[in-house]
Amino acid sequence: QALIGAEDAGRDMEAVRNALLHRFDENAFARVIYTESHDEVANGKARVPEEVDPGNASSWAAKKKSVLGASLVFTAPGIPMIFQGQEFLEDDWFHDKDPLDWSKKERYAGIVRVYVDLIALRLNRRGQTAGLCGQQIDVYHTDQRNKVLAYHRWQDGGRGDSVVVVVNFSTQLLENYEVAFPVAGEWKVRFNGDSRYYDPEFSNGGVYRCD
């Protein structure tokens, strides 16, 4: 509901926080994390972009919430799962006799790049985000009024390991908003889901200072 609700007032950051921290038998990898699955989008049920903006699954709001959902899936502790076509904003409900609309892969190439980049971060392919492969998470910033969460992911901690994820669930671009970091030192932005690199309609907002 935090993703697909029309009004910011209905987004419950405590519920999202609890979902991020939930695990079975103290093992983060005993659960699968997703926003779309066979059961969720089959038999006439809608996919996330369609739920966000019915009849206009390629709108700014639909794309933003799709990217936000993907960002959570690939940075939360657990086994990430995406459903076929999710990476290019497939909006039709799943039916095993209907093929995917592969033209959307080119039409929404920027959204596909979101998934490529998030998968690379999740797998620590550049040796900078090992924490996303680990068990540990600390949701240390929960702002119910502005609909912002920040959490620290780590495996052993330190350079090339610790990762901070900041997510804005609201429909507003927040300027001059400050979030503390868990430890002192130099931090670098590795992914900005609001970048126009991913979609020309995005605001290109993001972190201007990290220390």
Regions found by a protein language model. Name each.
Residues 1-95, 123-129, 136-193:
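Conserved alpha/beta catalytic core and glycan-binding cleft of carbohydrate-active enzymes
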Residues 99-100, 105-112, 117-123, 178-210:
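C-terminal accessory region downstream of the catalytic core in glycan-modifying enzymes
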Residues 4-5, 209-211:
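A polyampholytic, Gly/Pro-enriched intrinsically disordered region
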